[in-house]
Regions:
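ATP-binding N-lobe of GHMP and related small-molecule kinases
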Residues: 1-86
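FAD-binding core of FAD-dependent oxidoreductases
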Residues: 9, 14, 25, 29-31, ...
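Short, contiguous, pocket-lining structural segments
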Residues: 30, 59, 90-98, 186, ...
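Short loop segments at secondary-structure junctions
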Residues: 41-46, 108, 137-138, 175-176
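Short glycine/serine- and small hydrophobic-enriched flexible loop segments
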Residues: 69, 101-108, 214-217
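Phosphate-handling active-site elements
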Residues: 73-79, 106-119
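DPxDG-like acidic metal-binding loop motif
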Residues: 92-112
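ATP-dependent small-molecule kinase catalytic core of the GHMP/sugar-kinase superfamily
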Residues: 114-228
Length: 230
């Protein structure tokens, strides 16, 4: 069974490109200790369809299916079992983590898996840098950690900073739909403008959260419930 940690984006700047492996984001985020567990089994079914099972039920997960297709495992009659430590749709990068976890069950070359999962996320507009940040922590065997993505895309320069302090994560409702934001040119301009001037010199959990708060305030992405209590 493979495990892939989740990721919280704190700041990001969008870098579009026709090549999905080059397209991505720069910015900073936290890679968590919790994430996605995956097992892939060939059930010897009568159909060649690959299916996703979550909490005992078949679910739609086009990103994960596309990722394993890119690895060459389309229509193999595979059953992909996913177990999540973190909730979906709450900003934990579960879409990318699920895709990467499934890929790692089928292919042990991390770089190939990262390319497949990242491209699938780009195609479905569910993420830009989650897979890259997560992969950085996996390669260094460090999580929880803060990952700074200095360059976009699969071959972009990144740097990882271990988190030694204890921290608490609170959730207040569901987050905004990622694909909706990435498809809106006005949002892209707002986000890229807000990311200008953010420095990543002295990276600690406190400075990272402070930068994330400033970024969400400048973009208007901050949850109103959180802004009132934090």
């Amino acid at each position: 069974m493979s495990f892939v940690p989740g990721h919280i984006s704190l700041t990001f700047s969008i870098w579009p490109d026709k090549d999905p492996l080059v397209m991505g984001s720069t910015g900073m985020g936290i890679v968590l200790s919790e994430g996605v567990h995956c097992a892939v089994i060939n059930e010897q079914s009568t159909t060649n369809e690959n299916i996703i099972i979550r909490k005992g039920e078949k679910v739609e997960d086009p990103v994960t299916l596309r990722a394993i297709e890119l690895l060459g495992f389309n229509n193999k009659g595979l059953t992909i079992y996913l177990r999540h430590d973190l909730p979906l749709g709450s900003g934990f990068g579960i879409s990318g983590a699920s895709a990467l976890a499934a890929c790692l069950e089928l292919e042990k070359d991390l770089d190939l898996c990262v390319k497949a999962a990242h491209q699938a996320e780009i195609e479905f507009k569910t993420g830009l840098g989650d897979v890259i940040a997560i992969a950085t922590s996996l390669k260094n065997h460090i999580f929880p950690s803060i990952v700074v993505r200095h360059e976009p895309g699969c071959n972009g320069k990144t740097k990882v900073y271990p988190i030694d302090e204890k921290f608490l994560i609170c959730i207040s409702g569901l987050g905004r739909d990622t694909s909706e934001i990435l498809s809106d040119k006005e949002w892209v301009e707002i986000i890229n403008s807000a990311a200008l001037g953010i420095q990543y010199n002295d990276v600690t959990i406190r400075s990272a959260i402070k930068a994330g708060r400033l970024f969400t305030e400048k973009t208007g992405l901050i949850n109103k419930n959180i802004s009132e209590i934090f």
